[in-house]
């Protein structure tokens, strides 16, 4: 018999029949919607980076964009290479079903092969297209990888300071985010601190080199020592349960003379996550990849787990158009010179004004010591001069702030008097 047989078909009566709980019926009767409170909290509390960026947009509308110096976001001001536009024009000549149709979930075979062959040319490897899974950018690469290599209750180690969304993605995978403090002098990862953070529940370690937010590039020696420690831990574990090293590499191409070692050649249980948001200045197009190296003893099972994670998280396929762009532009160089020019102009001036910072070897961020212990208070004071910086607390380390110098050169130069005025104000306190 239908549950509706003896009920008038009002929404409240239907809800009461289908969901006979006091909490639901009370909320429904009041016109409230039952929602996932965890997701609500995550959405209601936006990241500090996005909050500052939104504030900057408001101020620009009020006083003019040229009067606001927004260093909050890693949004490249360097144009995408000309080859990108040419590739798009070429793709537009394709039949609509090819241009806009679904691709295979792991990506176009020719795109996956192009990525593998590019890596082989650069690092002397022998990867194949089957080792590459195309994604909707680095965020998707990381969330898929985390969900593929962890189980609820596991722990994932991050190197503090770290990109704040790591914690969000780790916790939403049902895991605990464990911070291992970087070396406070060099901001190289501290192998000793990682070792102290490892427990029987450790499933993975995330590294990010060149690093966001410090600009540090982890040396081969540092990575080799980390690999040795992880191998020692793995030797005491079930062989089917090694610690996975997740190498997050969206800034690999943006370096100032430093070597960025190829991590899979150092530690076999490595998965690489990559994005073209920074190297090709395509942050809004959302295209990247996951590499599960064929040298990883669990490669076949891991790739299936990555595919399963992408499926359950709702990532149908990477953007078809931009997979074709990647095929054409796979080895296009980044305009590192523009970022180097910005870096020099900013660091020379801040040093003169008395600021202390970490010399960045890569990426396009400057990690600067706040002029008072409370970085949040410092960044609020900086707003008086229309200087928008991200306080370090959300990166897992107090007392610093991050500047994204991927802005225009004019923004750098025009902001310098304000940085001097801010420093002068602190000297007079």
Predicted feature residues:
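Charged, glycine-enriched surface loops/patches
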Residues: 57
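PLP-dependent class I/II
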Residues: 6, 11-50, 60-93, 106, ...
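Short, surface-exposed loop/turn segments at secondary-structure junctions
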Residues: 98-103
């Amino acid at each position: 018999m239908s549950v509706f047989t003896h009920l008038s078909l009002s929404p409240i009566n239907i809800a009461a029949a289908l969901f006979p709980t006091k909490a639901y019926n009370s909320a429904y009767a009041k016109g409230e919607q039952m929602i996932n409170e965890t997701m609500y909290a995550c959405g209601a509390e936006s990241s500090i980076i996005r909050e500052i960026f939104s504030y900057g947009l408001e101020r620009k509308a009020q006083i003019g964009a040229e009067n606001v110096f927004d260093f909050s976001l890693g949004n490249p001001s360097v144009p995408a290479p000309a080859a990108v536009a040419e590739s798009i024009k070429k793709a537009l000549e394709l039949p609509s079903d090819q241009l806009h149709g679904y691709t295979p979930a792991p990506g176009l075979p020719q795109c996956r092969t192009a990525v593998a062959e590019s890596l082989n040319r650069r690092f002397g490897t022998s990867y194949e297209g089957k080792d590459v899974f195309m994604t909707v950018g680095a965020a998707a690469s990381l969330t898929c990888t985390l969900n593929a290599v962890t189980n609820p209750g596991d722990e994932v180690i991050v190197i503090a300071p770290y990109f704040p969304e790591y914690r969000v993605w780790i916790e939403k995978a049902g895991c605990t985010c464990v911070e291992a403090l970087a070396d406070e002098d060099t901001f190289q990862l501290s192998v000793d601190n990682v070792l102290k953070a490892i427990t029987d529940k450790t499933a993975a370690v995330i590294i990010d080199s060149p690093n966001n937010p410090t600009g540090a590039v982890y040396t081969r020696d540092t990575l080799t020592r980390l690999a040795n420690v992880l191998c020692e831990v793995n030797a005491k574990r079930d062989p089917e349960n090694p610690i996975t090293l997740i190498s997050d590499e969206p800034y690999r191409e943006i370096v100032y003379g430093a070597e960025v070692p190829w991590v899979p050649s150092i530690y076999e249980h490595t998965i690489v996550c990559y994005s073209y948001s920074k190297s090709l200045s395509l942050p809004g197009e959302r295209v990247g990849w996951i590499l599960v190296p064929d040298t990883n003893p669990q490669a076949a099972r891991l790739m299936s787990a990555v595919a399963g994670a992408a499926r359950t998280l709702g990532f149908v396929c990477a953007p078809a158009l931009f997979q074709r762009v990647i095929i054409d532009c796979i080895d296009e160089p980044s305009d590192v010179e523009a970022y180097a020019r910005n870096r020099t102009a900013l660091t020379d001036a801040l040093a003169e004004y008395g600021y202390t910072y970490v010399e960045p070897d890569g990426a396009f961020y400057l990690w600067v010591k706040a002029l008072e212990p409370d970085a949040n208070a410092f960044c609020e004071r900086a707003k008086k001069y229309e200087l928008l910086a991200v306080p370090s607390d959300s990166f897992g380390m107090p007392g610093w702030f991050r500047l994204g110098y991927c802005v225009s050169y004019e923004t750098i130069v025009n902001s310098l008097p304000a940085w001097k005025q801010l420093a002068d104000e602190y000297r007079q306190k």
